[in-house]
C-alpha cells in the first residue's frame, strides 16, 4: 500500500489540472498563434510560467486504483501488476489465468 500522502498529493494535482485546464489551453493558444504580436505572446508565456507547476497534466502520476502503487500500472485497467495478479488468482478478472510451465 502506498503512502496516503503520496496518493493525496496526486489527487490534488488531478484537481489542479482540471481547474486550470481551460486557462492553460487559452494561454498556449495565444503562445502558438504566430499572428499575435511578440509582446502579447511573451506576456502569455510569462503568465503560463507563473501558474503552479502542479497544474500541468504531465505532473500527474498513473497510480493503481487498488493499492496506490506508482510503478508498473496498466493503463487499461488502472491496476498495478501485483493487484492484477492478486485479483486474477482469486478469479475476479474474467479470462485471466495464471500461467505455469
Swiss-Prot record:
Keyword Ribonucleoprotein: yes
Keyword field: Ribonucleoprotein, Ribosomal protein, RNA-binding, rRNA-binding
Biased composition (Basic and acidic residues): 1-11
Molecular functions per Gene Ontology: rRNA binding; structural constituent of ribosome
Region named Disordered: 1-22
Compositional bias per record (Basic residues), positions renumbered to this chain: 12-22
GO CC annotations, alphabetized: cytoplasm; small ribosomal subunit
Example GO biological process: translation
InterPro entries from the UniProt entry: Ribosomal_uS14, Ribosomal_uS14_bac/plastid
Family affiliation: Belongs to the universal ribosomal protein uS14 family.
Subunit structure: Part of the 30S ribosomal subunit. Contacts proteins S3 and S10.
Function comment: Binds 16S rRNA, required for the assembly of 30S particles and may also be responsible for determining the conformation of the 16S rRNA at the A site.
Listed HAMAP family: Ribosomal_uS14_1
Name of this protein: Small ribosomal subunit protein uS14
Naturally occurring in which organism (per UniProt): Afipia carboxidovorans (strain ATCC 49405 / DSM 1227 / KCTC 32145 / OM5)
High-level lineage: Bacteria, Pseudomonadati, Pseudomonadota, Alphaproteobacteria, Hyphomicrobiales
Amino acid at each position: 500500500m502506498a503512502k496516503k500522502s503520496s496518493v493525496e498529493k496526486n489527487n490534488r494535482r488531478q484537481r489542479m489540472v482540471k481547474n486550470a485546464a481551460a486557462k492553460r489551453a487559452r494561454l498556449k493558444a495565444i503562445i502558438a498563434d504566430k499572428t499575435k504580436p511578440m509582446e502579447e505572446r511573451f506576456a502569455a508565456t510569462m503568465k503560463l510560467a507563473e501558474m503552479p507547476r502542479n497544474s500541468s497534466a504531465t505532473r500527474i502520476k498513473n497510480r493503481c486504483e487498488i493499492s496506490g502503487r506508482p510503478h508498473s500500472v496498466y493503463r487499461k485497467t488502472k491496476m498495478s501488476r501485483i493487484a492484477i495478479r492478486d485479483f486474477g488468482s482469486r478469479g475476479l478478472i474474467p479470462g485471466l489465468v495464471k500461467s505455469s510451465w
